[in-house]
């Protein structure tokens, strides 16, 4: 199966994927969001996950993602367990929804932050991979401001993702988001013209 109308959108934390997705949505493009699906799956499978990580991650029968994150981002084995549990479920859900969107014969986007980490085009047979790029120093600066995390926490989270420069080398198209919102809009427009 090849998803000929699907374009994978990826990037690291703090590169501007969310802003780019808002621009694409405002232009009428359909987006399949791996993170939203992951959040739904975390809730659906919260009891299984709590068996692994302890009932402290549940509050009134709702999984507290911050508490779970505090555990998994400090322990590579626990993060691997969670990813091994979730990623096949996310993929199944994404591909099912993508097959429906293929029927429209129009370009759409799969927002998969960990696209390369989970197997890239072997796991998600898309037509193109677009990277939203910002250099690592800018990622850190944005995360310090946006998420109010300590630099050590940011570095820990960045270490869990493939280096942004590696992703850049593996992508089919780069949207450089190291400047202004106005420039990002121009770059998105330039990319969209390649779809015509």
Swiss-Prot record:
Reaction(s) catalysed by this chain's protein: 3'-dephospho-CoA + ATP = ADP + CoA + H(+)
Statement: the UniProt record of this protein carries the keyword ATP-binding: yes
Transmembrane annotation, as ranges: none
GO molecular-function terms, A-Z: ATP binding; dephospho-CoA kinase activity
Localization: Cytoplasm
GO biological process assignments: coenzyme A biosynthetic process
The family this protein is said to belong to: Belongs to the CoaE family.
NCBIfam families named among the record's database cross-references: dephospho-CoA kinase (TIGR00152)
Protein name per Swiss-Prot or TrEMBL: Dephospho-CoA kinase
